[in-house]
């Protein structure tokens, strides 16, 4: 199947209703994608040790010779794995990985991954499940706003299971740390209360390339072509909607 087979050529890009959206924000992590050199080992660990079922394993859309796997945390939250044939296997602590949940690592890299359960009882049950598979666990630890256990996963992953929700920003934004981060009192109020946005009937035009803004890294010509394409062209050209194993009719 080609990418253009999945969506009719005349299919328009999705549209939205014009409205002020005071609470518009991402409401969770749909999937966190982790690079791997051993898809089977990762899926096996997450199923056996953590109880997370494998929900998808297929050729990654638009990427040659690359596997994409998903394990389920909940119905709208997954851990994903990407096995590209050129993925390096070397771990360099402090650069590619943090050595432990409190260790330094390159900015933008994953420091540790914390997964939610509802109660301390479930945290302790997860501790026992993980230990029953021979994996050592540190904790529990009460951080005040969350209660956590810490352990390691394949390929140098630093993992955490915790319970806790509804963090009170009036208690948990330390003025000393705020100042050391160069954040003024006015700025912290803006960070605590992001401004609403008014979304119009017409899509916001793609902004011009600006090196001062975050950008995905592609070869220059490829990047300009992708960012210069219309939303409808991307929707029609890159969408792949058919699962690899269709349900029987």
What are these regions (language model features)?
Residues 136-140, 148-149:
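Catalytic micro-motifs at enzyme active sites that drive phosphoryl/nucleotidyl and oxygen chemistry
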Residues 62-66, 143-147:
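Short acidic/glycine-enriched loop/turn segments that link adjacent beta-strands
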Residues 57, 67-68:
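N-terminal juxtadomain amphipathic helix
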Residues 1-29, 35-56, 73-136, 152-249:
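Glyoxalase I/VOC metalloenzyme domain signal
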Residues 60-61, 70-72:
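Short secondary-structure boundary/capping segments within folded domains
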Residues 58-59, 139-142:
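Short beta-strand
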Residues 68, 78, 148-149:
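Short hydrophobic/aromatic beta-strand element in the GNAT-like acyltransferase core
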């Amino acid at each position: 199947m080609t990418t253009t087979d999945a969506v009719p050529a005349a299919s328009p890009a999705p549209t939205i209703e014009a409205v002020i959206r005071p609470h518009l924000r991402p409401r969770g992590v749909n999937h966190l994608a982790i690079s791997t050199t051993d898809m089977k080992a990762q899926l096996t660990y997450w199923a056996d040790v953590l109880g997370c079922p494998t929900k998808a394993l297929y050729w990654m859309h638009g990427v040659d010779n690359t596997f994409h796997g998903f394990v389920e945390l909940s119905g709208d939250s997954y851990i994903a794995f990407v096995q590209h044939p050129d993925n390096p296997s070397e771990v360099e602590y402090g650069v590619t990985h943090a050595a432990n949940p409190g260790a330094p690592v390159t900015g933008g890299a994953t420091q540790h991954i914390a997964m939610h359960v509802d109660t301390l009882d479930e945290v302790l049950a997860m501790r026992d499940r993980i230990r029953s598979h021979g994996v050592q666990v540190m904790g529990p630890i009460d951080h005040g706003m969350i209660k956590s256990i810490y352990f390691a996963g394949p390929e140098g992953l630093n993992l955490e299971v915790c319970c806790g929700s509804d963090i009170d920003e009036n208690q948990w934004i330390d003025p000393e740390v705020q100042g050391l981060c160069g954040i003024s009192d006015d700025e912290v109020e803006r960070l605590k209360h992001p401004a609403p946005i008014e979304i119009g009937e017409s899509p916001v035009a793609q902004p011009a390339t600006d090196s001062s803004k975050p950008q995905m890294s592609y070869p220059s010509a490829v990047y300009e072509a992708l960012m210069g394409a219309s939303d409808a062209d991307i929707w029609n050209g890159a969408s792949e909607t058919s699962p690899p194993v269709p349900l029987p009719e």
